[in-house]
Amino acid sequence: MEARSQLRHRPTHREAQELGFERSVEPYFRWNVRDSQTRPGDIVLCRGCNNLVRIAIVSDIHGNRTAFEAVLADLRQSSPDLILHGGDLADGGSSPREIVDRIRDLGWQGVLGNTDEMLARPESLTEFASQTPQLKPLWAVIEEMAAASREALGEERLAWLGKLPRAQMHGPVALVHASPDSPWRCPMPEASDVGLEAVYGPVGRSIAVHGHIHRSYIRSVAGMVVANSGSVSLSYDGDRRAAYFLLDDLQPSIRRVEYDVDKELKALAGCGFPHADWIARILASGRYQAP
């Protein structure tokens, strides 16, 4: 593990209280500040620092508790100053309820993913599916999975998901799930520079990060960085490991984390959710598979 080139003083609990900070249940992961300029729960730049040294973005967990716990262990080593989630928290895995509860306990700020939206607002899937009627069998499978996830989550968790914002802005970083205009559509890694700039240039930050497509990349485009964080679960790039984005002193990278895929496959087999066999095939191969 490479050493951090700049280290900031992490305040003691007493110092933090005197400055108006609240310590999270996971002291590695969050410092919140309360003052007249922030809303409850906002995460801000550390007081006394001009910039965050390290920012991590963890996206597309998809209810995969085994992969998520492995990523948390890696985050304890990389020790970011701020962690954001990129949405798609619950649907598509063995543990939707446990993932939502864990994210809330950690206090991570994040953005609305398309599967979060379809769980909280079922009509959003109908609206999007109507644009691609040729994929009607796929949308039917996804709706059956979503119905089971909604039942597992319950109304209160669904309401929380539905209130997630569509974007987060922190220092030089803008985070969206797919694109600034939609959590459902975004360019692919092979998109042209012009295409990426057209979508992400309007965010007005030097670094734009998104999730959604489960294929990580980092591109330099028109004086800014556009990156995909990769996915904690259901990788589509042939690498079964979990992935997340790390910005270290403005140097972006993708972290890959080994986890016990077989353990998660067993959890899927026993969860009772519809089409768990489909999800298992994607997890086992690290590539998208048709239902």
Residue ranges of each PLM-predicted region?
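Short, positively charged low-complexity motifs
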Residues: 4-5, 20, 24
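Active-site-proximal beta-strand elements of phosphoester/diester hydrolases
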Residues: 54-62, 172-179, 226-230
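Core catalytic region of metal-dependent phosphoesterases/phosphodiesterases
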Residues: 54-149
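Active-site metal-binding loops of divalent metal-dependent hydrolases
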Residues: 59-61, 87-89, 108, 114-117, ...
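Active-site environment of divalent metal-dependent phosphoester hydrolases
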Residues: 62-67, 91-94, 115-121, 181-183, ...
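Acidic, His/Gly-rich catalytic cores of divalent-metal-dependent hydrolytic chemistry
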Residues: 219-291
